[in-house]
C-alpha cells in the first residue's frame, strides 16, 4: 500500500512503516501471469471514447493549458497501474483508465509516463500535471500538493478458496505468508511475526517475491498458506484466478487515495476535481473499478480531505 500504515493491534509492537510502495527494480513490470495462466473475464476493457467532453468543466482549465494532461505513474502495481495489453508494454490498470476518462471529460489528450514512485510528487507542476499512482492521502503529502480523493483501499489477507486450513485473520501465527517485496505489507509481515514470538507462538514464515503475480501463483499452488496485499490487489487476485483465492477477514486500515495536483495550480485542481466528480456522478468511475473486479469507489471527489 502506498501510504503510512496504521497497524492492527496484533502487529502494533515494533512495527516499521513505509511512506510508499516500491519494488526492487525501478523498471516497470507486467502485472498479469505469464502464458495466460489464471486469466478470467476480468479486466473488462474500458473504452474511453464512451465518455464525452463536458464543455463547462473543460472551460475551467487554465488559459495556458497546452491540451495534454501529463500524468506521472508507477507502472508496477496491478491492478491499479502496470504494463499489459497484447504487447505487455502498454500502460494498463484502473488508474490508467481513470486518467483517460478524466482527459475525455476535459477534452484533453492524456500522456501517462512511468516514474519511480518517490519521484512523482516532487515533479508535479513541472514534469507532470497530475500524479495518479495509488497515492494515499497523508498530512505530509497534503503539505506539498493538492489531493483529490477518488478511491478507498486497505490491506487484506487472502487464502485459497474455502479456507482449507481454517485460518483466522486475527491469528496467523505458524503460517507461511507471501508478500510482494517493498510493499507496506512486506514491513507489516515482520511486525506480525514478531508479535507471534512475543506471545510465545510459532512465528510466521514470510516468503517475499518481487512480483505480486508470483505471490498469487504460489498461494494457488499451495506453497503459501496466506497472502498479504492491498485490498485491490487481493480482489484482483480473486478474479484473475477464476475464484481460486478469497479474502480472509475484513479490509484493514482502509484510507482514501488521491489524485495529485500542484498546490499553486488552483484552476487545474478545480477542473480535475470537477471532472472526477462528473465521472463519479455518471457512473463511469464505478464502471471502471467493476471492470477490474475492485471495490472502494468514492462518491465525492473531496479536495484535501483530512488525513
Describe each region flagged by the PLM.
Residues 6, 18-33:
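Bacterial lipoprotein signal-peptidase II cleavage site
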Residues 30-131:
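Extracytoplasmic small-molecule ligand-binding "clamshell" domains
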Residues 89-104, 135-137, 156-211, 226, ...:
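Bilobed "Venus flytrap"/periplasmic-binding protein-like clamshell domains
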Residues 109-170:
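Acidic, polar ligand-binding/catalytic clefts
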Residues 152-159, 239-275, 294-307:
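Periplasmic-binding protein-like
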